Amino acid sequence: MEHLLQFVWKHKLFPLTPLHTTQGQTVEVIDPGLPNSDAGPDFFNAKIKIDGILWVGNVEIHVHASDWKRHHHHQDRAYDSVILHVSSDIDTETFRTDGTPIPQMELHYPPYLLDNYRELIETSHYPACYRLIPRLPKLLLHSWLSSLQTERFEQKTQRIQAQLTQSKGDWEQAFFLTLARNFGFGTNSDAFEQWAQTIPLQAVNKHRDNLFQIEAIFFGQAGLLQELPSDDYSAQLTKEYAYLAHKFELQPSEHLRWKMLRMRPGNFPHVRIAQLANLYHRSQGMLSQLLLASTVKELRDLLRGGTSLYWLTHYVFGESSPARPKTLSDASIDLLIINTVVPFLYAYGKHKGEEQLTERAGNLLEQLKPENNYIIRLWKECGLQAAHAGDSQALIQLKKNYCDTKKCLFCRIGYEYFKKKEG
């Protein structure tokens, strides 16, 4: 309920009748202040007139005034800057660390706000606001989706920064970790990322002109080369891997759980690893080349890939199948662009301070079709249809970061829902 009070305060949704402190002083809220998501008072730099005198400082909000002492604010100097304590239940006085009293105001709001809040939080419908969406202005929805897309970019940038730290600042290595994870296409993503963490790109680069040796490193580190090879090709790879493992002091992954049950053969980890090996055989500095590409076609051509001849007739070692090229489909390539290339382009642009790179990241998403998954289909049923991949990324962000966590108070659609007075 405290979040609701903060929401009411932030948007000044309380009655406009004269406000007073518990001591009878008049209160005029000039500026409610900036919300604070970290430790300290709830709102910074508020501007409030108390009995005609302008005060600039912080505001703290509680359901009960006694929460001030319960949270030990009376012993925390970070709260000495509070100029007004706002509660829906003033059940005690509040004091700063030096013993001086803090002006308090009881905050009331229309009953429909609480009713709307309960509707959103307690309803079994998903999303709870689905009835309102078709009635909202398109400009409002477009603006919200644009903000969500940027928010998703920033969130992915944080993950990339974590990968960079793990890779000791090596952008190519960090890119490989992310690309490998996304080559798992959900089902094997964790296994692919764990596998990629064991692959030193310096070793791969030294043998980049030899696809067979790259495959030996990749399959060996994946733990997919058996002690008793199932055919001549896997036997040759096993022998080559033993040599390269000794040369580069490689240790194969021991606890990877590759999933293949109820999976299309084209998605088997063997095929995906063979495709990755081919990509790194053909490209010197994969990230560098992708960053230079300015169109979706160029990116698709770089990522199209393929495999060595062996995999034209195999999905796993030792089991022949009718000959079929194992190239990535446009849909799969587009997912790699959306989830790997574009976030790295944005993150690299932020890192270098090159705005044209961050803008290109957004432009590339607008050139791609929206993703087709259950989240996007859900929003379409509610009246929110993605026009391009930028929109679909925004809608994924909306569901995962707002709807699933019931953060309706922080959502622009939720804000419109709270304000509505009709049922």
Residue ranges: model-predicted function:
Residues 1-6:
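N-terminal "leader" segments that precede or initiate the main folded domain
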Residues 44, 54-55, 60, 66-98, ...:
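N-terminal accessory interaction module
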Residues 148-394, 407:
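Hydrophobic, aromatic-lined core segments that form the binding pocket/scaffold
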Residues 65-67, 90-92, 111-113, 185, ...:
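Short loop/turn segments at secondary-structure transitions that flank enzyme active sites
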